[in-house]
């Protein structure tokens, strides 16, 4: 009887202590029962990760393959070896996607392997373009720059915008007295980025009409010789331009000549100053060449004149046949338009004339400051680009020092279309 009582007490104690209850499964011994444990086998990989990686979540000795140790198993890792090149990229480039020491050749570091990179050396010139022109597409130091940027060398002449000075020679610095268009002469204009120049060619006097007597000057009325109130020796001016071009690289220059001398005298002027060999001759109807090709071939000067085409001098391009201009010398901004005033509006090369005249018909620095102001000139250029569906090739101004014509052209040249986001002010 006494033994039965003791047995009963012992069983009761065991039952109330829970010692006879069934044990809860906990494979990894982390104190979390398996039914609630996100990593049953305690191998550092969650159950779902192991299932996705075709690994056994119930075996702590079996873990997913993870070559680069980024806790992303290789079957689901876009970059198995962790070398920053995706497996797909390495496969395309012919390197081992599970060997971090095997990486694609990438000369310019743009994460596009050289084999598939159109610009392997990262100099903004396509490999094929460089090869065709004798440059090394694998040497970032072997390149050409046009107007300060290699990428502009790919642009055609008519797909670039040049700052242009109207009556470029008519300056206070050059001691012109009446009808002054600018404060400073050619050197300052060049230094600030002007690369297109409108000039007027006359003989120095009615009695001096030899080829050596060509001057740049312009008339202020019908009663006086055009050079009475100031002139610039055309030979000296052109020699300076030639020197500036010789000491520069990658610049394409344009002259628009309002001409009043024989074509043979202009030919003498260009020959005597060493400029003749620079001149590019365009064939009407052909596409304009790229800036790069003009520079490479040493034909980086384009000359237009305001006369009919001359068969003996085909390099003197009739501006009205090879291009067109807007109106000019209006009295107010409200009168300015974008439409064709002179020339063939179907041609891609054109001049956006942007200067006003005073009530006396003369250039006016105050009016120039108004229309050359950055936002004003930029907005007009974009408006005309949109309206004519063609970027202005030239933006021509009086008193270039007033306002920011060169900064406007810098901004325009950063854009491929008028609807692009406008870049920040240079």
Language-model regions, residue ranges each:
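Catalytic cores of phosphodiester-bond hydrolases, prominently lipid phosphodiesterases
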Residues: 144-426
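Secretory-pathway extracellular proteins and peptide precursors enriched for disulfide-bonded cysteines
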Residues: 11, 45-49, 63-65, 85-89, ...
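Extracellular calcium-associated, cysteine-rich motifs in secreted modular proteins
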Residues: 19-147
